[in-house]
């Protein structure tokens, strides 16, 4: 966007500072000293990242001035600076007292951009924002946080990925395979992602019927637009 022209004049989309951001309210203590943020992590530094291109070409009026179908969305100079996270990625450890002592559960929170509303860049960024957490739980060494600490989640740590990820593992306009790969990873509790503990609701199934939805898992829908995007 153009400097001073909302909502596209910053790293993230918004009509005011903090729009579409998120907050955490916890019954248990948040380990703020060991909370990590990744707001400044650059997209180019994600393993496998490439400059997104214009791939949705049915409406050329949406193309940036002077660009055509197939062009790279960013110049090389822009790509060197652009951030991955459209809002923030946060690892907040929660300290939970148990009869055997304190147990730590890492809340991996984010709100990726929707895979829509432009000509292909958002599709790629949404997938990359979700893939970041997949690589994070694999403790990839290239990851760095906003304080300069490197590496991801240490082996054996408990975690919950949460937030509006804007990506359904089996339906929608996003790159569903990215969420499928995360769900299928042995590091993730398979009873939750592919088994009996997956959150479902009667309301979701009723909504699917009301909207004549073709979603293959209608009782998992979390949004009024008929997709399972919240975790």
Where are these regions (language model features)?
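Active-site surface patch of divalent metal-dependent phosphodiester/phosphate bond hydrolases
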Residues: 1-64
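Short, P/G- and charge-enriched loop/turn segments at secondary-structure junctions
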Residues: 7-13, 76-81, 217-221
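Short, solvent-exposed loop/turn and secondary-structure capping segments
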Residues: 9, 34-39, 108, 118-122, ...
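Extracellular/periplasmic catalytic domains that process cell-envelope and extracellular macromolecules
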Residues: 15-19, 83-86, 98-102, 152-155, ...
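Beta-strand-turn-beta hairpins that frame and shape the catalytic cleft
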Residues: 29-32, 47-55, 80, 84-111
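Acidic/histidine-rich helix-loop elements
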Residues: 65, 73-77, 117-125
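A Trp-anchored, charged/polar loop motif used as the substrate-binding/catalytic surface
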Residues: 70-97, 134-151
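Metal-dependent phosphoesterases centered on the DNase I-like endonuclease/exonuclease/phosphatase
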Residues: 113-231
């Amino acid at each position: 966007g153009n400097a001073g022209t909302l909502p596209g004049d910053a790293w993230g989309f918004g009509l005011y500072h903090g729009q579409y951001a998120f907050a955490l309210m916890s019954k248990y203590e948040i380990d703020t000293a060991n909370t990590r943020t990744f707001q400044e992590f650059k997209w180019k530094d994600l393993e496998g990242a490439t400059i997104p291109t214009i791939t949705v070409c049915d409406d050329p009026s949406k193309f940036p001035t002077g660009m055509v179908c197939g062009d790279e969305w960013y110049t090389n100079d822009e790509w060197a600076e652009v951030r991955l996270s459209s809002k923030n990625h946060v690892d907040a450890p929660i300290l939970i007292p148990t009869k055997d002592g304190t147990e730590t559960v890492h809340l991996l929170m984010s709100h990726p951009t929707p895979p829509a509303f432009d000509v292909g860049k958002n599709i790629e960024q949404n997938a990359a924002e979700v893939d970041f957490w997949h690589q994070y739980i694999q403790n990839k060494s290239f990851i760095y946080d906003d304080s300069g600490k490197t590496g991801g989640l240490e082996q054996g740590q408990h975690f919950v990925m949460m937030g509006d990820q804007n990506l359904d593992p089996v339906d929608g306009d996003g790159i569903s395979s990215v969420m499928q790969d995360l769900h299928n990873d042995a590091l993730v509790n398979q009873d939750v992602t592919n088994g009996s503990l997956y959150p479902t609701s009667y309301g979701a199934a009723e909504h699917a019927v009301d909207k004549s939805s073709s979603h293959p898992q209608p009782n998992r829908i979390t949004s009024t637009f008929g997709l399972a995007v919240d975790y």
